[in-house]
Amino acid sequence: MAASDALQSIVYSRGSLRLLDQRKLPLEMEYIDVKSSADGWNAIRDMVVRGAPAIAIAAALALAVEVSDLDFIGTPEEAASFVSKKLEYLVSSRPTAVNLSDAATKLQTLVSKAAETAKDSKSIFQVYIEAAETMLVDDVADNKAIGSHGAVFLQRQLANSKKISVLTHCNTGSLATAGYGTALGVIRALHSGGVLEKAFCTETRPFNQGSRLTAFELVHEKIPATLIADSAAAALMKQGHVQAVIVGADRIAANGDTANKIGTYNLAISAKHHSVQFYVSAPVTSIDLSLPSGDEIVIEERSPKELLNSEGGLGKQVAASGISVWNPAFDVTPANLITAIITEKGVITKTDADGSFDIKGFLLPAK
């Protein structure tokens, strides 16, 4: 069972999981076998797989593979506890992305309820495996809905433009999800509809997800695209080359504040200054209503080597020995800089009354 996109970060069939090692792209395409939750944890932490939706699916499936042939001796309640603890462990691999913790919570609730009526531990694992597999299928469908909603909305908002050029950041395509993509899914939909002039992508330092992954996907699918340095984005907007910026999200607070790849905040400020529309594109699982604002979002800090060495820390040292490093993986873009939030349920726009997002009000009827 796998997504149908030509580029697949996750290749799964029951009892087997292979993850595309995205650290080696675009020069090599190598898949790594994942046979346990420990393998999954390491793959997520080491960024073999990345992207908020993808890591949630990869984590869930890693545990599904582990329990598919597990010789477990215990009651249904003990099996549910085993699954729950493994999921807690997997969540610790990357704390900023809410998709992972959201998926874990849903799966924990599911197996706990199943344990109330299950006759043996094997049936608990079966329930878990089927639920994890459903998440994989649903993610692709949700991504395509995001792309469709986003493309239609952008065309309405930019009706005066015969064709639309957009800028995107990091990687939000089929490599960051189970298939198709979120922000890159919108770009795909615009291209399929014949209204995309060009997609610009940032290199996205220090791990270069834009130059290594997004550029790779765009070239692979023959979408007209241009790669720019992160520091060239403001100049690009000033010269009028883009009408919109579209980014993904790792966590969206109740007020619309959005945590995404470091550098997103810079782009939002530049977009506001140059009157360029700024869109966040993400599944509703990226929304965390328990957080009133982005101030409460935990920001992961990564290894200094990503800045000290070339190739996002994988190459030779390029910085002076002894220099201190601050390397946050994400930043938080305030809601007032965001034009709208594109989800699989539709587009969340700001209220006329005070210009804020009523995300809770949007989600209640959508569920």
Curated annotation (Swiss-Prot):
Entry keyword set: Amino-acid biosynthesis, Cytoplasm, Isomerase, Methionine biosynthesis, Nucleus
Principal location class: cytoplasm
Catalytic activity: 5-(methylsulfanyl)-alpha-D-ribose 1-phosphate = 5-(methylsulfanyl)-D-ribulose 1-phosphate
EC number of this enzyme: 5.3.1.23
Listed pathway(s): Amino-acid biosynthesis; L-methionine biosynthesis via salvage pathway; L-methionine from S-methyl-5-thio-alpha-D-ribose 1-phosphate: step 1/6
Active-site residues, record numbering mapped to chain: 250 (proton donor)
Functional note: Catalyzes the interconversion of methylthioribose-1-phosphate (MTR-1-P) into methylthioribulose-1-phosphate (MTRu-1-P).
Family membership: Belongs to the eIF-2B alpha/beta/delta subunits family. MtnA subfamily.
UniProt protein name: Methylthioribose-1-phosphate isomerase
Taxonomic source organism: Zea mays
Lineage: Eukaryota, Viridiplantae, Streptophyta, Embryophyta, Tracheophyta
